[in-house]
Amino acid sequence: MAKKDQEFVKDITNMDEDFPQWYTDVITKTDLVDYSPVKGFMVIKPYGYAIWENIQAFLDRRFKETGHQNCYFPLLIPESLLNKEKEHVEGFAPEVAWVTHGGSEKLAERLCVRPTSETIICSMYSKWLTSYRELPYLYNQWCSVVRWEKSTRPFLRTSEFLWQEGHTLHETAEEAQAETLQMLAIYKEMAEDLLAIPVVDGRKSDRERFAGAAATYTIEALMHDGKALQSGTSHNLAQHFTKAFDITFQGRTGELEYPHHTSWGASTRLIGGIIMVHGDNRGLVLPPRVAPTQVVIIPIAQNKEGVLDKAYEIKKELEAKGIRVTLDDDTNYSPGWKFNQYEMKGVPLRLEIGPRDIENNVAMIARRDTLSKDSYSLDNIGDTVKNLLDTVHTDMLERARAHRDSKTFTFKDYEEFKRKMIETPGFAKGMWCGEEECEAKIKEDTGVTIRCIPFVQENLGETCQFCGKPAKHMVYLAKAY
């Protein structure tokens, strides 16, 4: 075996001893990404991109089912457009990358590489919209954005990342709010039904909301190490951008009106979430519905008569059920090496078939999530595997929920909160006064932020547990990626 192959299946860093190094080991050894010559710009390799494609497919289907259309807007945005919404430009100014020259000629106006597309899209909407009859505008684009980050980590925080961003216009405030919450619900559905990641949904505090938004809503997931990951956001932008960009339409009474505006997005950081919620010390553990390969078939003693034929027959039967299958008949590697390889890559099910199995009309199937292995009849193997994949998804979601709940705590006072955040980091549930000064002090003292004001509220007391003033909300707090 070549040295490179030996390195590939070698143990990775223990996640409980050095979680950041564990994460780096996993993303590189499983061939998800590589580092490019430009700091903060990652190369997403085919295996990593296939995961993104499955996320795309789920979201794209749900967007279209809810009436949205895909389109594409330019990468470069004139500085004058970016400056039109004051709060927005101030929020993004430190992260903007600028184009100053075209060839050797200096441009008359700087162009920013889009950090997000509200401004360029609103400039076009102002040209297009004339009447209430044209509303709503329900547009989405799949693209990359650039935010010049100082500290980067693949998938979690990179200077360039892939995402989708939806931008909609509505006749009324009520319709815009309904859209904002509908899209957040789709993100929650995606997290739980596709990625097997339980999330807390709610509203961001004013301090944490999107620059230029009236309100930002979020889904928050908890990683293995007790840090939170913002996994999708939906913004009610009210009329902030439509007024700044003079987007008007003739209303039902004949008067000119400003439409109500939303935007919402999810990105490749979701892949980082999958890794950190489900992974273990053997590598990736991929939820079946997002895994590029759901089942790998490994023939045992494949040189024996009938083994490969049966393996391909099983592959065909599984594919007929819509299951994504890889059959590894490469004779350069032993079955044991393949077992290690596909475990590290997180393939949900491994099906082994050899002469004795064929004789007994069975196959051995190993689950990546539990590392258990059992014998299953080859009769109706397609239905058996399909049901097993659903079981794996359900079990992974419930394990992740149990882990999150075990790392969610309440506290009697600020001192206990600070101590628990150091000793047993996770989600803290506490009562908060709603004041920005109090929130800023929490972050300054501890590095912890309010992740959201959850839709489902609990009354844990009448006073703010951080400053003693009357409490307005129960909030979730955590350190975050």
UniProtKB/Swiss-Prot annotation:
One of its GO terms (molecular function) is catalytic activity, acting on a protein. Keywords: Aminoacyl-tRNA synthetase, ATP-binding, Cytoplasm, Ligase, Nucleotide-binding, Protein biosynthesis. Its main location: cytoplasm. Its EC number is 6.1.1.15. It catalyses: tRNA(Pro) + L-proline + ATP = L-prolyl-tRNA(Pro) + AMP + diphosphate. Signal peptide: none annotated. One of its GO terms (cellular component) is aminoacyl-tRNA synthetase multienzyme complex. SMART domains: ProRS-C_1 (SM00946). The keyword Protein biosynthesis applies. It comes from the Bacteria. It is found in: Cytoplasm. It holds the Pfam family tRNA-synt_2b. GO terms for biological process: prolyl-tRNA aminoacylation. Catalyzes the attachment of proline to tRNA(Pro) in a two-step reaction: proline is first activated by ATP to form Pro-AMP and then transferred to the acceptor end of tRNA(Pro). Can inadvertently accommodate and process cysteine. Misacylated Cys-tRNA(Pro) is not edited by ProRS; this function may be provided by ProX. Homodimer. Consists of three domains: the N-terminal catalytic domain, the anticodon-binding domain and the C-terminal extension. Belongs to the class-II aminoacyl-tRNA synthetase family. ProS type 3 subfamily. This is Proline--tRNA ligase. It comes from Acetoanaerobium sticklandii (strain ATCC 12662 / DSM 519 / JCM 1433 / CCUG 9281 / NCIMB 10654 / HF). The gene is proS.
